[in-house]
C-alpha cells in the first residue's frame, strides 16, 4: 500500500493541512499546481523520526514554506508542530487526521 493510500484511501485528490489541493498523480511534481511531497511533521533536524507516524502528505509549496521549522507561516496563518494528544476528539487538526501520528500541526494565534 502506498503512503497516499494509507493517508487518503482511494481518493484521487485531497487537501493538505493548509487547505492546498493535491492530486494523487502529482507526487514530486514541483511545477504542478497540485504537486505534493512527503513531509516530516517534526523535522529530522529537530529530533523527528523517519517513520510513517512522523510523516504527512503536503503540497510542494507547503513543504517548501514549512521547511525544517516547528513554528511557521503559510498564507499569513501561523502554524506550530505539537505533540499529538491521542484522544479521539483531538486527533483532527486543520481537517487532517493525526490519530496515527506522534505530532500534529495546529493553527495558532499570531
Tell what function each PLM region has.
Residues 1-28:
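Short, charged surface segments at domain edges that flank catalytic/cofactor-binding sites
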Amino acid at each position: 500500500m502506498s503512503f497516499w493510500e494509507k493517508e487518503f484511501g482511494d481518493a484521487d485528490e485531497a487537501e493538505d493541512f493548509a487547505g492546498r489541493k493535491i492530486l494523487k498523480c502529482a507526487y514530486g511534481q514541483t511545477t504542478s499546481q497540485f504537486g505534493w511531497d512527503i513531509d516530516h511533521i517534526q523535522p529530522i533536524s529537530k529530533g523527528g523520526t523517519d517513520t510513517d507516524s512522523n510523516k504527512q502528505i503536503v503540497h510542494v509549496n507547503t513543504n517548501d514554506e514549512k521547511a525544517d521549522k516547528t513554528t511557521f507561516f503559510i498564507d499569513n496563518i501561523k502554524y506550530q508542530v505539537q505533540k499529538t494528544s491521542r484522544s479521539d476528539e483531538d486527533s483532527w487538526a486543520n481537517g487532517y487526521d493525526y490519530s496515527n501520528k506522534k505530532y500534529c500541526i495546529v493553527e495558532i494565534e499570531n
